Structures are given as C-alpha cells and as structure tokens.
Amino acid sequence: MDMNKDLVAASATPLVLAILAEGDSYGYAIIKRVAELSGGHLQWTDGMLYPVLHRLERQGHVAAKWAAAENGRRRKYYRITREGRAQLAAQRQQWQAVDGTLRGIWMKACTV
C-alpha cells in the first residue's frame, strides 16, 4: 500500500520521538525501526529522516553526540530530551484526538 505523502510527513515527528523514547539511536537504525514498526508500509530514506532530526535538534527536543560504533566508525547518536518527551506526550494526545474523530466519522459513514 502506498502511503500518502502528507500522512507520512505528519507522522514523522511523533514516530522519531517515540523511537528515541525507547533509547538512543542513530539514523540508519531509526529508519530500520520505522520500517519494522510499520510492518514495511513506511520506507523512509536519509532524505526524509535527517531534516526531521535536525529540526528536532534545533527545537531542543533531541540532542546529538558523536560516538564510536562497534566497528570503530563514528556515528551520530540521537537522544530525546526532557522537552522532547513533553512534545511527544502532547503529540500523542493530538494524534489520539484525530484518531478518535476519524473513527467516529468512519463508523457513522459506514452505517449510512
């Protein structure tokens, strides 16, 4: 199933914050986790992820640091901040409201 580009963009921030709430991570691992969580429906690229990470970093919702990976190469690891956790909680409430509204509308539409 092809996902609507607007839906993918709208879900990017809460997805990234939720993944980082599980623990620190780096770009490629975040992309893999998105694919895993979506059952393969969301196939992100570097070009989709890094602008989101950079924006979240500018907003103070994510912090980044360089560290050596197991193979000795340096990777940039991202972690969610206290402000990011607050933003995640706010976005969760907003998405739950949208979900509830859509479910209600769709249930009525299916009975008409």
Short names for language-model regions:
Residues 60:
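Glycine-centered, phosphate/nucleic-acid-interacting loop/turn motifs that mediate DNA/RNA or nucleotide
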Residues 64:
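Short beta-strand "wing" residues that participate in macromolecule-binding interfaces
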Residues 70-92:
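Basic, amphipathic "hinge/linker" alpha-helix immediately C-terminal to the N-terminal HTH DNA-binding motif
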Residues 86-112:
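Amphipathic alpha-helical dimerization/coiled-coil segments
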Residues 4-48:
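N-terminal helix-turn-helix DNA-binding core of bacterial DNA-binding proteins
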Residues 49-56:
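Basic amphipathic alpha-helical segments that dock to polyanions
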Residues 4, 67-68:
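Short, solvent-exposed loop/turn elements at beta->coil junctions and helix N-caps
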